């Protein structure tokens, strides 16, 4: 699947490969914006919303091979043969999965805050419960969604991070 992207053109044109920035779980393409701002001087930057995140398509399949294929599909749609990938957390595992699927598409790879191992800890169950509760409710505003999330989560910072992806239907 082709992912939603934000593309930025390098201010100083070099022959460097473009850099694809891949966010972590519950994130969006904005999450690595600080890196994008620093790197765009010398590199074309592509920030992606991974599947089921941000404005990218939704799909019941959510695994690393599928996410790696999405990156290939996105490169194909943009007519990019090879890129440098920087992935954070879930994005890091997705770009590591890309090494098995399409190693020829990778110029360089940076995985941040993740290792290529299985994580058996179910540390996001409360977050999924909060997101599901909002999805199943008739919440139409960020305030309503936040109130529902507070029934499942105690960390206000996590709630505010999750609300970045909430669409206030009054603004549509």
Regions found by a protein language model. Give the residues of each.
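Alpha/beta-hydrolase fold catalytic core
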Residues: 1-20, 40-43, 80-82, 171
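Active-site loop/oxyanion-hole signature of alpha/beta-hydrolase fold enzymes
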Residues: 6-8, 33-40, 46-90, 94
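Active-site glycine-rich loops that stabilize anionic/oxyanionic intermediates
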Residues: 24-27, 89
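Alpha/beta-hydrolase active-site loop signature
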Residues: 26, 50-54, 116
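Flexible "cap/lid" loop of the alpha/beta hydrolase fold
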Residues: 96-101, 107-145
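Conserved alpha/beta-hydrolase catalytic His-Asp/Glu region
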Residues: 122, 137-172
